Amino acid sequence: MSLSNSLGLLGRKVGMMRLFTDEGDSIPVTVVDVSNNRVTQVKTQENDGYVALQVTFGARKASRVTKPAAGHLAKAGVEAGEIIREFRLTADVAAQYKAGATVPVTAVFAVGQKVDVQGTTIGKGFAGTIKRHHMKSQRASHGNSRSHNVPGSIGMAQDPGRVFPGKRMTGHLGDDTVTTQNLDVIRIDEARQLLMIKGAVPGSAGGFVTVRPAVKVKANNTDVKGAN
């Protein structure tokens, strides 16, 4: 199968480690488990109005699957997964797959390729403006008695008499869907279906991520020769 510009893989963030090149340079990498990506449906222009590949990842107990989902998965002949995502494709690429097929990592990615990784960031709960928006704290003394870690003025006087929408204030921090772009694939463990991607990716260890070929490709300056 040829590499696709649109097809990606679902995976689970295992954690971070480092690899060393032949020159002794240390490369921080995130290990992503992309094993057992299974095709649950091939959507076509004639039947669905667009072309896409529906993929599932992970394993879920049959008792935790709704009846409509169970019937959908049984029709494809695959076991229930933890997450299901769609990848928009061209018709010629989608025609290479059938429902029930497994997508191996080497069919989508190669060492040295740029990828975009989407995940859910770690939730921080309710946070103040200093932690949430990196604002500066106020003076510790010299007339300041109770306003050390507050944002200060959030509006104006009677005109306009309101707080403008979008004002940076306290609130929930984290637990957002974030995409980190243009990360390098340093190494692929084909036997265990692992991707080793340079740098950090969103989320905590054990979280689900979606890995796609990079959309905004930049020049690759990473030397991965002999990374082990």
Curated annotation (Swiss-Prot):
Gene Ontology molecular function: any one: rRNA binding
Spans annotated as Disordered: 135-159
GO biological process, one term: translation
N5-methylglutamine modified-residue sites: Q158
Pfam families: Ribosomal_L3
GO cellular component: cytosolic large ribosomal subunit
Composition-biased stretches (Polar residues): 140-150
The keyword Ribosomal protein is assigned to this record: yes
Keyword flag ATP-binding: no
PTM info: Methylated by PrmB.
Family: Belongs to the universal ribosomal protein uL3 family.
Oligomer and partners: Part of the 50S ribosomal subunit. Forms a cluster with proteins L14 and L19.
Function: One of the primary rRNA binding proteins, it binds directly near the 3'-end of the 23S rRNA, where it nucleates assembly of the 50S subunit.
Database matches in HAMAP family: Ribosomal_uL3_B
NCBIfam families: L3_bact (TIGR03625)
PANTHER family in the cross-refs: 50S RIBOSOMAL PROTEIN L3, LARGE RIBOSOMAL SUBUNIT PROTEIN UL3C
Name of the featured protein: Large ribosomal subunit protein uL3
